[in-house]
Amino acid sequence: MVKLRLKRCGRKQRAVYRIVAIDVRSRREGRDLRKVGFYDPIKNQTYLNVPAILYFLEKGAQPTGTVQDILKKAEVFKELGPNQTKFN
Protein backbone atom coordinates (compact mmCIF):
# COMPACT_ATOMS: atom_id res chain seq x y z
CA MET A 1 0.00 0.00 0.00
CA VAL A 2 1.21 3.49 -0.86
CA LYS A 3 0.84 6.54 1.39
CA LEU A 4 1.37 10.22 0.81
CA ARG A 5 3.35 11.43 3.79
CA LEU A 6 5.94 13.96 4.96
CA LYS A 7 9.67 13.28 4.76
CA ARG A 8 11.80 15.51 7.01
CA CYS A 9 14.63 17.53 5.47
CA GLY A 10 16.58 20.60 6.53
CA ARG A 11 18.79 21.18 9.52
CA LYS A 12 18.30 21.15 13.28
CA GLN A 13 15.52 23.44 14.51
CA ARG A 14 14.79 24.37 10.87
CA ALA A 15 12.76 21.49 9.50
CA VAL A 16 11.26 21.50 6.03
CA TYR A 17 9.31 18.60 4.62
CA ARG A 18 8.94 16.90 1.27
CA ILE A 19 5.58 15.38 0.48
CA VAL A 20 6.35 11.96 -0.97
CA ALA A 21 4.56 8.87 -2.19
CA ILE A 22 6.12 6.02 -0.23
CA ASP A 23 5.42 2.40 0.62
CA VAL A 24 3.77 1.89 4.03
CA ARG A 25 6.50 -0.46 5.20
CA SER A 26 9.29 2.08 4.58
CA ARG A 27 10.81 4.27 7.28
CA ARG A 28 10.16 8.01 7.34
CA GLU A 29 13.53 8.67 5.71
CA GLY A 30 13.31 5.62 3.45
CA ARG A 31 13.35 5.48 -0.32
CA ASP A 32 10.31 7.18 -1.80
CA LEU A 33 8.48 6.29 -4.99
CA ARG A 34 8.15 9.91 -6.07
CA LYS A 35 8.43 13.40 -4.62
CA VAL A 36 5.08 15.13 -5.12
CA GLY A 37 5.41 18.32 -3.09
CA PHE A 38 7.20 20.49 -0.57
CA TYR A 39 6.08 22.08 2.72
CA ASP A 40 7.90 24.67 4.82
CA PRO A 41 6.02 25.23 8.11
CA ILE A 42 8.21 28.16 9.18
CA LYS A 43 7.62 30.28 6.06
CA ASN A 44 4.21 28.63 5.56
CA GLN A 45 5.04 27.82 1.93
CA THR A 46 3.64 24.88 0.04
CA TYR A 47 4.42 23.55 -3.43
CA LEU A 48 2.29 20.71 -4.79
CA ASN A 49 2.66 18.73 -8.01
CA VAL A 50 -1.11 18.34 -8.39
CA PRO A 51 -1.13 15.95 -11.41
CA ALA A 52 1.23 13.56 -9.60
CA ILE A 53 -0.83 13.75 -6.39
CA LEU A 54 -4.06 13.08 -8.27
CA TYR A 55 -2.42 10.13 -10.03
CA PHE A 56 -1.46 8.49 -6.73
CA LEU A 57 -4.83 9.24 -5.11
CA GLU A 58 -6.66 7.68 -8.07
CA LYS A 59 -4.48 4.59 -7.77
CA GLY A 60 -5.49 4.20 -4.10
CA ALA A 61 -2.77 6.00 -2.15
CA GLN A 62 -3.83 7.11 1.34
CA PRO A 63 -2.66 10.52 2.63
CA THR A 64 -1.64 10.84 6.27
CA GLY A 65 -3.59 13.25 8.46
CA THR A 66 -1.15 16.14 8.06
CA VAL A 67 -0.83 15.69 4.31
CA GLN A 68 -4.61 15.46 4.02
CA ASP A 69 -4.93 18.82 5.84
CA ILE A 70 -2.37 20.39 3.47
CA LEU A 71 -4.22 19.03 0.43
CA LYS A 72 -7.59 20.25 1.77
CA LYS A 73 -6.18 23.74 2.25
CA ALA A 74 -4.92 23.69 -1.35
CA GLU A 75 -8.33 22.40 -2.54
CA VAL A 76 -6.82 19.39 -4.33
CA PHE A 77 -9.77 17.16 -3.43
CA LYS A 78 -12.16 19.28 -5.52
CA GLU A 79 -10.45 17.89 -8.63
CA LEU A 80 -11.27 14.31 -7.63
CA GLY A 81 -14.63 12.69 -8.17
CA PRO A 82 -17.09 12.70 -5.24
CA ASN A 83 -16.68 8.97 -4.61
CA GLN A 84 -12.87 9.17 -4.41
CA THR A 85 -12.54 11.57 -1.48
CA LYS A 86 -13.02 9.06 1.35
CA PHE A 87 -9.83 8.04 3.12
CA ASN A 88 -9.12 5.88 6.15
UniProtKB/Swiss-Prot annotation:
PROSITE patterns for the chain: RIBOSOMAL_S16
Domain of life: Eukaryota
UniProt GO molecular function: structural constituent of ribosome
Entry keyword set: Chloroplast, Plastid, Ribonucleoprotein, Ribosomal protein
One GO cellular component, as annotated: ribosome
Subcellular localization, as worded in the UniProt entry: Plastid, Chloroplast
Keyword Plastid: yes
Keyword Ribonucleoprotein: yes
GO biological process: one example: translation
N-terminal signal peptide: none
InterPro entries documented for this protein: Ribosomal_bS16, Ribosomal_bS16_CS, Ribosomal_bS16_dom_sf
NCBIfam families: S16
Family: Belongs to the bacterial ribosomal protein bS16 family.
Name of the protein described by the UniProt record: Small ribosomal subunit protein bS16c
Gene encoding the protein: rps16
